[in-house]
Regions:
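Surface-exposed binding/hinge segments that line
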Residues: 86, 121-177
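Aromatic- and charge-enriched surface segment that lines or borders ligand/interaction sites
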Residues: 73-118, 145-147, 155, 239-245
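Extracellular/periplasmic solute-recognition and catalytic clefts
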Residues: 118-121, 202-213, 229-259
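Short, solvent-exposed loop/turn elements at domain surfaces
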Residues: 31-37, 58, 63-66, 94, ...
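Bacterial N-terminal signal peptides
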Residues: 1-9
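Short, well-ordered beta-strand elements
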Residues: 19-28, 72, 82-84, 104-108, ...
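N-terminal lobe/hinge region of extracytoplasmic solute-binding protein
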Residues: 25-78, 109, 116, 192-198
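Gly/Pro-rich hinge or "lid" segments in bacterial periplasmic/extracellular proteins
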Residues: 59-61, 162-223, 227, 237
């Protein structure tokens, strides 16, 4: 479940802790928000992909392949300007609310309306705050349609959906309940989550520690890990010492000299 985090972690070392928990050391200076629409950098992506579910994802065994996630299948029309996704049934958010096509549509629209870091690639495909409500829609339960605003290779759009990790399903009811002054819940999602992923956020203290616990109702099956802890360390040398002592399982982005 932590394949993407490990894939993008850079220099990584491993030690041993109890088999049902994972302790990860990293420099958390750049971990500024947990909002998928605002995330930048691999550190936050590695966390977000375990709190949320995407429509589709890359196959970690073959990164050129796209595989189902919340969407079980998809097709492109003959005109190659419309992608239709068919959603998996029975998936629930951590709140207990069902994951619906309306949640997926709202989540993608939110990216363009907020116009934060993750909006840039979608704007390059022609999506905008003005047209996204028309171009991204759910014509019926369990169906999500993405209409391309301008000529693009739909295979490239599909790959972007799978690779970027930004188009994840947010629990729209929960987020909207925490909306302040039309911010689409951005302030609340900076330090909270509203996902359906394999892990739930328990707590986060900036530049200190972030705790996750497993989602026992996860649609892919209950994760083997009961707990994941991210701890902040400023210096690479400290990470190396913690690995040597056996206090960390993984140390992210260590300097080459410490590996």
């Amino acid at each position: 479940l932590f394949a993407l985090l490990l894939m993008t972690a850079g220099w990584t070392a491993q030690a041993k802790t109890p088999p049902d928990q994972l302790i990860i050391g990293m420099n958390m200076n750049n971990l500024l928000t947990l909002d998928p629409a605002a995330m930048t950098g691999n550190d936050i992506v590695g966390i977000v992909v375990n709190l949320y579910d995407p429509l589709i994802e890359l196959d970690p065994q073959q990164l050129t392949n796209v595989r189902p996630a919340l969407a079980t299948s998809w097709e492109v029309n003959d005109a190659r300007n419309l992608i239709t996704f068919h959603l998996r049934e029975g998936v629930k958010f951590h709140s207990g609310n069902p994951v619906t096509a309306d949640d997926v549509v709202w989540s993608m629209r939110r990216i363009l309306h907020l116009n934060l870091a993750q909006a840039s690639v979608w704007k390059s495909y022609g999506f905008s705050k003005k047209n996204v409500d028309e171009m991204v829609r759910s014509p019926s339960p369990g169906i999500v349609e993405i209409q391309l605003p301008k000529p693009n290779d739909p295979k490239l759009v599909i790959y972007s959906l799978a690779a970027l990790g930004s188009v994840v399903a947010l629990d729209s009811k929960t987020v909207q309940a925490h909306e302040v002054n039309g911010d689409w819940g951005n302030r609340w999602l900076t330090t909270n989550e509203a996902g359906s992923g394999p892990f739930r956020l328990d707590s986060w203290q900036a530049k200190d520690v972030l705790n996750m616990s497993r989602n026992p109702q996860y649609w892919r099956g209950e994760p083997k890990l009961s707990r994941v802890v991210f701890r902040h360390f400023q210096e690479s040398q400290t990470l190396r010492l913690m690995i040597e002592k056996g206090d960390l399982d993984i140390a992210n982005n260590m300097a080459v000299s410490d590996v």
